[in-house]
């Protein structure tokens, strides 16, 4: 083996450039809002849509489950207590589409609609 051949073997290999450029993480999309018909607006006393299914109590300020599309509470939130009140007092007495209102009973008309 000649000196030239041995020198060629000892040369370091050329530096390789990375094939793939590092990708930036994809931006996280904000959660899509549900349709207005299925939202509850505690301050305005809006109705719950049948798709939402209700099921929330007054402590969380959500919907009542009344026939699958109950009402939302329009009055201010009550102070949390260790005692849980029955949800029926905050829900409409009729399923969605009825004429009764929320707000402590079907006789009061200060709450949301069904």
Swiss-Prot record:
Family matches, as Pfam families: LCE (PF14672)
Chain positions covered by the region annotation Disordered: 1-21, 75-114
Presence of keyword Transcription regulation: no
Induction: By UVB.
Low complexity bias locations: 1-10, 88-99
Tissues expressed in: Skin-specific. Expression was readily detected in adult trunk skin, adult arm skin, fetal skin, penal skin, vulva, esophagus and tongue. Not expressed in the cervix, rectum, lung, colon, or placenta.
Superkingdom of origin organism: Eukaryota
UniProt keyword list: Keratinization
Basic residues composition bias: residue spans: 75-86
UniProt GO molecular function: identical protein binding
GO biological process terms, semicolon-separated: cellular response to calcium ion; cognition; keratinization
GO terms for cellular component: cornified envelope; cytoplasm; perinuclear region of cytoplasm
Free-text function comment from the UniProt entry: Precursors of the cornified envelope of the stratum corneum.
Miscellaneous section: Belongs to the LCE cluster present on 1q21.
Family affiliation: Belongs to the LCE family.
Subunit structure as annotated in this protein's UniProt entry: Interacts with CYSRT1.
Protein name, entry field: Late cornified envelope protein 1D
Organism: Homo sapiens (Human)
């Amino acid at each position: 083996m000649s000196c030239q051949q041995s020198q060629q073997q000892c040369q370091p290999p050329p530096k390789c450039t990375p094939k793939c450029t590092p990708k930036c993480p994809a931006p996280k999309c904000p959660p899509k809002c549900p349709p207005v018909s299925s939202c509850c607006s505690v301050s305005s006393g809006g109705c719950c849509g049948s798709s939402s299914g209700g099921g929330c109590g007054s402590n969380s300020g959500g919907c009542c489950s009344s026939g699958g599309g109950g009402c939302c509470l329009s009055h201010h939130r009550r102070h949390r207590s260790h005692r849980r009140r029955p949800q029926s007092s905050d829900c409409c007495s009729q399923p969605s589409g009825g004429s009764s209102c929320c707000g402590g009973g079907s006789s009061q008309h200060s709450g949301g609609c069904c």
